[in-house]
UniProtKB/Swiss-Prot annotation:
Organism: Anemonia sulcata
Lineage: Eukaryota, Metazoa, Cnidaria, Anthozoa, Hexacorallia
Record SMART domains: KU (SM00131)
GO MF, one annotated term: serine-type endopeptidase inhibitor activity
Pfam families: Kunitz_BPTI (PF00014)
Keywords: Disulfide bond, Nematocyst, Protease inhibitor, Secreted, Serine protease inhibitor
Gene Ontology cellular component annotations, sorted alphabetically: extracellular space; nematocyst
Ranges of residues in domain BPTI/Kunitz inhibitor: 5-55
Name this protein carries in UniProt: KappaPI-actitoxin-Avd3a
């Protein structure tokens, strides 16, 4: 797994509401979260597909 995928989800201090995806190392899945727009980390992807590709998630049912 890419090291960025092990980072915790960070919403950040700003108040924007961007739908993003992050890799949840507990569930071993990419999950949606709302990103505030600043102060995040590299575990922050624009699409579910990008998150799964970078973090090596095997999608169920595909």
């Amino acid at each position: 797994i890419n090291g960025d995928c092990e980072l915790p989800k960070v919403v950040g201090p700003c108040r924007a509401r961007f739908p993003r995806y992050y890799y949840n190392s507990s569930s071993k899945r990419c999950e949606k979260f709302i990103y505030g727009g600043c102060g995040g980390n590299a575990n922050n992807f624009h699409t579910l597909e990008e998150c799964e590709k970078v973090c090596g998630v095997r999608s169920v049912g595909r």
